[in-house]
């Protein structure tokens, strides 16, 4: 959620939407992702999401829907990408490869096929943005993933919600 562009091209921190967290945690659980990190520099945004996570994992919601509880246990809140990378490195004993995603094309992109091979060999941190995209120049990354392309060929429209992009990318990486 930071740093991202708003619709006017200004660098901002976008608001965290609770249903993004719930849906993406469910996707993560479905595809065997070890952890879902949500990065936001503002305490109030992290606290709001923490209350939702706690309701479903420790509060009354844990009795209502055990699947949601299990999925939301994957969520980790952080104030910076550096914290996330250090946490993964501590747990995996190796620094993760950081994968930048964007709807825009860029030279030297990694293909889904190549990333699918890397996922088997190395810890991967895939960055998904909100708003009008992540600020490429402010985020250290190892590879940029090719964008999701629509149908039919030549369809330039690809302004997807973060939930949709996550679902498509995880399916492409972990499908049989």
PLM feature spans:
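RNA substrate-binding interface of SAM-dependent RNA methyltransferases
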Residues: 1-103, 167-170, 174
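Surface-exposed, flexible loop/turn segments at secondary-structure boundaries
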Residues: 4, 44, 106, 132-133, ...
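Conserved strand-to-helix beginnings and helix N-cap segments that scaffold or border functional pockets
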Residues: 49-50, 112, 159
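Structured adenosyl-cofactor binding patch, chiefly the S-adenosyl-L-methionine
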Residues: 132-176
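A short acidic, often aromatic-flanked loop/helix-cap motif at beta-alpha or helix-coil junctions
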Residues: 80-86, 106-107, 150-155
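Alpha-helix boundary/interfacial micro-motifs
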Residues: 49, 57, 119, 146-147
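Long, charge-patterned amphipathic alpha-helical coiled-coil/hairpin "stalk" segments used as oligomerization
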Residues: 100-141, 147-148
